[in-house]
Amino acid sequence: MLAIPMTAAQAYNPTGGTVYQLGSEPCLKGRFNCAVYPKSAQLPSGRLVASFEKSTVVTATGSADRQTLPIHKSDDDGTTWQPLSEVKAPAYLSTDPRYAKYTSNWTNPFLYVLPERVGDLKAGTLLLASVVSGDDQYYKEHKSADPNWTPSNDGDRGDMAIALYSSTDDGVTWQVVNVVATGGWQGGSAGAVGQNIASANKYKQVDPLWEPYLMVHRGKLVCYYSDENDYIGFDPATGVPRLDPANDTAKDSHGQILVHKTWNGKSKKWSEPVVDIAGLTEDMGGGKTEIGGGRPGMTTIVPTADDKWLLTYEYWAGGANTRYRISDDPLKFFRGSPTGMGVDALPVVAGSRPLAAGGSPVLVRLPDGRLVYNAAGSGNVWVNDSGRTDGVWKEYQTTSRAGYSRNLQYVEGTGRIVILNNQGTSTIAHAEVDLGDSAGAYQQLVNRKTGQVIGTGNNSTDANIGNGDTPDVALEDAGAAADPDTQYWHVVTKSGGGVTLLNKSGGRAAAIWTGNATAGQRIGQWVDDSTTGTWTVVRSTNGHVKLQSVRNKDLYLTGASADAPLTLQNATTDGSQDWKLVR
């Protein structure tokens, strides 16, 4: 038996803060999306690194020329963040003439730590894949014509491509590795597709590349990405798309497909692209058709516990705008449906809503096999405990509100998820969420009066989701729960003082249900987002403690009788407010 075994506060900040806030400096595009698309990775040292698009006007050039991607770091498990470095465009990091046209390191960073050696790249190397480009000619032309002009949306950059960088010193310095794939003109994509066209874009082309996603598979590095080049179809045997011979000059389809390339880490070039999601086939007239209708985009992909692969993406041709596909082989998604199924078709447990839609889906696999999903339409996440493609999903609240391009980062060392999010007017925010089974000791809290322990009636998620919007924390016989984890709790010290009880089954806090700290109020599971679930530990006798409400110091956590719901009550000496923590 332990008196008060607690988890340290240093690496826990559930409500989070700000990584970056746009100031008054001018932007190359609309201010609402001037800073967007945060992504992160964890290094072997434990450091977290993050990057995001920051499309402010480069002071030295007055344009997008010399734009960089910022790298920020956290050395305390995501609790605080500081600037670390800036990754320059290939033209300014390399003297190789092949990279001279790529003068802007623009957007869609994807950070990835190599889990094994790939060719000349050692295990543990930090990689960055990003969208690079030439200057924004639409911006330059409009500023030249009217110095007072202010952009309100995306512009038109030339020479768009996806570049690969590496760092061997935890993100401090960077080298260009190579160019993964090339596109053409941006053409206003994706906020003003085919509208914001520069005069220099003679044929009004819209052929950018977007959203790289890296992983290692069978000894090779794989880069998934979104491709707006114009393709007239693909080889059904190999999945290799057929580029329109008039891609650079013909009327643009404004379509997009999902593809991937592979690289062995030694060869000069990556493989040919292979289709993952082709989208609809569109009639371009004159007997020509092109794939890419519906603009599938933003690949995320994970292995599942039943030896399959689950891919999620956004889709804009009507019906479900956030979709998924399942494959036995992560390199052969082209063999299935060109449009996939809506994520709302995935099974959920009672009380949980269908998986969020709204585009920009994010999917991660935790070390224990659980799958975690989020999309732009909700601040909540959905967890598949089995990790199987036929597993059911359960909804959990988070402290990070809904937003475009959120990022979910599992943190080795805490077992929690750090969420990065674009909020409001180009604010990159961070928060943390506990989804259960996080690092540290769990204990049962035994009530002195009844001998029973604190449980949740087998509910593992927020009580408003999993218990019919009714508080669920109550006394139970030890070992009586069908899900044993629901009777175990972290006692976590908070940075502002006090402790929180976080349940092992889902990481939810034992909190005052109404938020009003008055006598008689019940206790229910809720995401750890306020002081309603924070307690002051007061030592009692014989190894017991009392848990005093931080919100109202006259009230204590109380189990009045056997099987009773937990409530807040004024101080009493009958043992109903005394608790012993037992492993």
Where are these regions (language model features)?
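Beta-rich carbohydrate-recognition and catalytic domains
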Residues: 12-36, 42-104, 113-203, 216-290, ...
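Repeated scaffold domains used in trafficking and secretory/extracellular systems
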Residues: 38, 295-300, 355-362, 402-409
